[in-house]
């Protein structure tokens, strides 16, 4: 049991409003990008490992999402992660402001939301924790998504250690 969204990020299907994206960047791609950002200092000033950056398309209210290979949820499992932003080069917060979303799809059906968190760059990371009990025994594709609130230029959104595990 268990599912590591960081390790499996290269197996996810990443898309933005501009179409399909290749995992791994480059971080200059105006269509948006998803890539590893290990051992980078985050907005809280701490250097983190297992950091997945998901930057939305560089337009107002841009989006990006990654649909992961199917997983069968085990009784008692939870989705956990810390969410936040990469800071500016000088370590201060930029204008990052997004909605982080955890969604899922069952059997190619419609996308169903599991959690949504609005976050601005404020010098802290936020811990998220979602009980997956309603999905126990179901085989679903989880989707990590970022929706920009307004301009997306500095939406260097990161998921730290995103995973499904038993507590």
Describe each region flagged by the PLM.
Residues 1-167:
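Gly-Asp-aromatic-enriched flexible segments
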């Amino acid at each position: 049991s268990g599912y590591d969204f960081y390790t499996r990020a290269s197996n996810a299907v990443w898309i933005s409003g501009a179409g399909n994206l290749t995992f791994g960047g480059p971080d200059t791609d105006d269509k948006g990008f998803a890539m590893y950002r290990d051992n980078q200092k985050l907005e809280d000033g701490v250097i983190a490992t297992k950091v997945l950056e998901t930057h939305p398309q560089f337009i107002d209210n841009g989006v990006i999402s990654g649909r992961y290979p199917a997983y069968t949820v085990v009784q008692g499992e939870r989705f956990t992660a810390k969410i936040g932003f990469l800071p500016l080069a000088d370590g201060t917060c930029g204008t990052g402001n997004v909605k982080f979303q955890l969604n899922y799809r069952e059997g190619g059906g419609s996308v169903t939301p599991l959690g949504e968190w609005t976050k601005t760059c404020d010098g802290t990371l936020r811990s998220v924790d979602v009980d997956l009990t309603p999905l126990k025994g179901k085989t679903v594709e989880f989707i990590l998504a970022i929706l920009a609130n307004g301009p997306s230029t500095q939406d260097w959104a990161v998921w730290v250690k995103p995973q499904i595990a038993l507590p």
